[in-house]
Swiss-Prot record:
It comes from the Bacteria. Belongs to the D-glutamate cyclase family. The keyword Lyase applies. It comes from Rhodococcus opacus (strain B4). This is Putative hydro-lyase ROP_32680. Keywords: Lyase.
Length: 262
């Protein structure tokens, strides 16, 4: 498997389908949602009112297949897997949406927590889903996002089990990257988020907790997909959860510098 963003996007364009967690360490990854221009303002307002799960990194012009985050990339072919939505229902899952793209579609690129996984792992915190070769588990919570126009829906979270003695470290590192969801929204008991069973994620794969692990939950960029379903958008194209756009932007660009206290 190649490890540069350009080579990985080329592999996806050629038909390689794999979750992107752990790929291209050091480079940001993004969620994708493309909606008709008639819905774009409502979606933009929804993201602005809910910046924790929906931090916007780029918005394309209507019909554009490009993004400043990955010059030369085609966002209709260069993600490993997409979802196509009609009237809020999942209509298809495919590795290429170029034939479905429309001149009125506006693409939103939303920060992804895979981006902070590299610095978290570099600090010695294990990533269980990467160790186990699986997609990160994601759950629909009972926490409603702030609605915006015709768009509403619940917050989705991703979960990573972290050894108890490293919980504060993982929280501190991710908190310095608010453009990719920042610090966790909850630590510990999943029932406080309305999650009944960690072994049955709504998206992604279940992950085994090791003895001493504590579940940590981060706001997730799949939240707009939950809003698509709840709001019954007539048409939308999104990434498949866990199958992101790998950008050319270093993850270090999204780290907030801590002022010198001296």
């Amino acid at each position: 498997m190649p490890d540069s963003p350009t080579d990985l996007r080329s592999a996806f364009r050629s038909g390689r389908v794999t979750p992107t967690a752990g790929l291209a360490p050091g480079f940001a990854q993004t969620n994708l949602i493309a909606v008709p221009q008639d819905w774009a303002y409502d979606v933009l307002l929804f993201t602005q009112r809910n910046p924790k799960p929906c931090p916007v990194l780029d918005v394309g012009d209507a019909g554009s297949r490009t993004t400043m985050l990955a010059p030369g990339a085609d966002i209709t072919t260069d993600l490993p897997l997409y979802r196509v939505w009609k009237d809020g229902e999942l209509a298809d899952e495919t590795a290429d949406v170029s034939s479905l793209w429309r001149d009125d579609l506006v693409a939103f690129h939303i920060g992804c927590s895979f981006t902070f996984e590299h610095p978290v792992a570099a600090a010695g915190v294990p990533l269980r889903h990467v160790e186990q070769g699986s997609n990160v588990p994601m759950y629909v919570t009972d926490r409603e996002c702030r609605p915006a126009g015709r768009v509403s829906g619940p917050m989705v979270v991703s979960m990573r089990p972290v050894p108890e003695h490293q919980v504060s470290l993982a929280a501190a590192i991710s908190a310095r990257m608010p453009a990719v969801h920042g610090g966790p929204v909850h630590i510990g008991d999943p029932t406080e988020l309305g999650i009944a069973d960690l072994g049955a994620p709504d998206f992604g794969d279940p992950v085994n907790l090791e003895p001493g692990d504590v579940p940590m939950f981060w706001a997730c960029g799949v939240t707009p997909q939950a809003a698509v379903m709840a709001s019954r958008l007539p048409f939308a194209i999104t990434h498949a959860p866990g199958y992101m756009l790998i950008t050319d932007t270093p993850d270090s660009e999204y780290v907030l510098e801590v002022p010198d206290a001296r």
